[in-house]
């Protein structure tokens, strides 16, 4: 028996390939994956035989979309910047050319969820922006309502403050840390 997400999967209402058959399951990927594994353990396996169960979660993979029940976790926390946050990578050419920098490479729409309904915020990468907006569109109405209630004020604040330079870099870091830790919280 096998049941896997397509690619890395989607956080909301993901498509699984269940023994070769694709099917979309409504809900949050971590909860669904865990429930499928527990169901197999309890109800579907041959209990007279040994088994190996490999359980791989979508979290903590990009784009770090938290479950709606975890959106407010860590709201009151400001995470300290790592000592090397503003590293210039002097003398380390390969490190200076990587594309995983919060400052340079973290996409405002795709990674940081600033997909506004007015379509005023744009990514530097049109493909990432399109995909970021598609991730939102996978949600059902209840998921969207919870998501919007949380993210819309953040989006409006982002638009109003027009952060640049260090202020923008540090804002990106806080957004990333909050979303990342909320997403992996679901695995605990």
Language-model regions, residue ranges each:
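Active-site-proximal cap/lid insertion segments
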Residues: 4-27, 43-47, 54-188
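Compositionally biased, low-hydrophobicity segments enriched in charged and small polar residues
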Residues: 37, 48-51
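Ligand-binding/active-site lining segments
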Residues: 30-32
């Amino acid at each position: 028996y096998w049941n896997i997400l397509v690619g890395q999967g989607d956080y909301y209402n993901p498509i699984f390939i269940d023994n070769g058959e694709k099917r979309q399951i409504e809900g949050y990927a971590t909860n669904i994956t865990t429930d499928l594994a527990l169901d197999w353990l309890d109800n579907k396996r041959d209990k007279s035989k040994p088994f190996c169960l490999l359980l791989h979660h979508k979290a903590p993979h990009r784009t770090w979309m938290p479950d709606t029940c975890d959106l407010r976790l860590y709201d009151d926390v400001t995470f300290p910047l790592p000592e090397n946050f503003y590293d210039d990578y002097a003398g380390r050419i390969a490190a200076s050319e990587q594309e995983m920098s919060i400052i340079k490479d973290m996409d405002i729409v795709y990674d940081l969820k600033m997909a506004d309904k007015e379509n005023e915020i744009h990514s530097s990468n049109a493909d990432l922006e399109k995909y970021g907006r598609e991730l939102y569109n996978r949600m059902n109405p209840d998921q969207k309502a919870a998501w919007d209630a949380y993210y819309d004020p953040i989006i409006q604040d982002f638009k109003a403050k027009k952060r640049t330079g260090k202020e923008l870099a540090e804002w990106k870091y806080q957004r990333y840390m909050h979303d990342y830790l909320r997403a992996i919280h679901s695995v605990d």
